Regions:
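Carbohydrate transferase catalytic cores enriched for Leloir-type hexosyltransferases
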Residues: 1-334
């Protein structure tokens, strides 16, 4: 059986990195299809592309795009149910897509894959499918994230916050906690991405505008150095299907503060400082501890470097291969 891979998801974002890492290890033929896989018209486009394939073929998508109708064996990755569980990240078309097309495909596809046990259980509950139809393949960390990379040296100490200005990234609470934390005022807070008026206005009102920086779009190759140079990663997200920044920071030897909700405690284990992401006071306390206690930072760094050994792309690819082999075997028997 020939399995075609939907490579259109490749990019610098989370799903894009998963796409590239699996492509390098699985070496599947790329599906002959163009267009944005997240487009509202893509279910039809993907359905038509699959109709053109020979019968003894299958399709694997590393993202959450699915065909209007499943006409060939199909496997895909649902990284999370963000658009269902976080209404501010959804709209009418996304709700229709998830509830009418994606949910049905969870029943019709050979298997749905996901990246954490949290997401797996959430998908099983939402789609109302048997447990065996959703497989947790985990996630990996690229070898470029390591403790011996050259750290970013801006001339001052900083806390690092990887985000995109979406509400579930919880950056307003991070900013408020940072402003209220009793720490060395020379320490700055650095965000990836561009500022928005809401955060800039909040920074001005909290009188920390000069202590907060936005890096704009950060090339992926620069991220390891930014992690490595930071006192800590501050990542108290309200919702994650996995949380790649947590393991990327750990791989660089950087201490992590993250949330005690969704997938994050599962990913971080005991190798991070866990806080209630809805509590500014807990985030503030975590920031104060990380900035004032070098022994805590050292301990979290060591634990993180051990923890991250669990997250290898080779392991993820092996789990995908197992599913592909099972699909081929069942297709032969049919």
């Amino acid at each position: 059986m020939i399995v075609f891979y939907d490579y259109r998801w490749a990019g610098d974002h989370g799903i894009g990195r998963v796409t590239r890492m699996l492509d390098a290890r699985l070496r599947l033929a790329h599906l002959n299809i163009s267009g944005n896989p997240a487009s509202p018209v893509d279910p039809l486009r993907l359905f038509l592309a699959m109709l053109k394939l020979p019968k003894n073929t299958a399709v694997f998508s590393p993202g959450y795009n699915v065909p209007l109708f499943v006409v060939r064996p199909y496997i895909f990755i649902i990284h999370d149910l963000n658009h269902i569980d976080r209404p501010e990240n959804s709209n009418f078309l996304k709700k229709i897509y998830y509830n009418c097309i994606l949910r049905r495909t969870c029943h019709k596809a050979f298997r749905a894959l996901t990246v954490s046990e949290f997401s797996r259980q959430r998908i099983i509950s939402w789609a109302r499918v048997p447990e065996g139809r959703v497989i947790n393949i985990g996630n990996g960390v690229d070898v470029n994230y390591r403790p011996d990379v050259d750290p970013y040296r801006p001339g001052y100490e900083y806390l690092f916050c990887v985000g995109n200005r979406k509400e579930h990234k919880n950056e307003a609470r991070v900013l408020e906690a940072f402003a209220n934390a009793v720490i060395d005022p020379a320490i700055r807070l650095i965000f990836t991405g561009n500022p928005n008026e809401k955060l800039m206005s909040l920074a001005r009102n909290l009188d920390v505008e000069k202590r907060v920086e936005f890096m704009g779009r950060v090339p992926e190759g620069d991220l390891p150095g930014l992690y490595r140079g930071a006192l800590a990663l501050i990542f108290p997200s309200l919702y994650e299907g996995f949380g790649l920044p947590v393991v990327e920071a750990m791989a660089c030897g950087t201490p992590v503060l993250t949330s005690n909700t969704t997938s994050l405690p599962e990913v971080a284990g005991d190798a991070a400082l866990l806080v209630d992401p809805t509590s500014v006071e807990q985030i503030k306390g975590g920031i104060e501890r990380l900035c004032s206690d070098p022994e805590l930072r050292r301990m979290l760094s060591e634990k993180g470097l051990q923890r991250v050994k669990l997250f290898k792309w080779e392991n993820v690819a092996d789990k995908v291969k197992t599913v592909l082999q099972k699909m081929e075997l069942e297709n032969k028997n049919d």
